[in-house]
């Protein structure tokens, strides 16, 4: 999982990527390709 300052590029990397909020942090999850997981500080 990458830690990024901006998730704008992370959510456009794959069409299955979704931006969600968990425990006060913003995550990008991708079920079909978990390589594209990311988190914002």
From Swiss-Prot:
UniProt superkingdom: Bacteria
Question: Where is it found, in Gene Ontology cellular component terms?
Answer: ribonucleoprotein complex; ribosome
Tagged with keyword Acetylation: no
Q: Name one GO biological process term.
A: translation
- Work out whether the entry's keyword set contains Ribonucleoprotein: yes
Any single GO molecular-function term of the entry would be: structural constituent of ribosome
Family annotation (InterPro entries) = Ribosomal_bL36 (IPR000473), Ribosomal_bL36_sp (IPR035977), Ribosomal_L36_bact (IPR047621)
* Keywords for the protein's UniProt record, in alphabetical order: Ribonucleoprotein, Ribosomal protein
For this chain, the family text in UniProt reads:
Belongs to the bacterial ribosomal protein bL36 family.
What name is this protein filed under? Large ribosomal subunit protein bL36
Naturally occurring in which organism (per UniProt): Xylella fastidiosa (strain Temecula1 / ATCC 700964)
- Provide the organism lineage as a comma list: Bacteria, Pseudomonadati, Pseudomonadota, Gammaproteobacteria, Lysobacterales
- What is the gene name? rpmJ
């Amino acid at each position: 999982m990458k830690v990024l300052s901006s998730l704008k590029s992370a959510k456009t990397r794959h069409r299955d990527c979704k931006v969600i909020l968990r425990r006060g942090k913003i995550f990008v999850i991708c079920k079909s390709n978990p390589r594209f997981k990311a988190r914002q500080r």
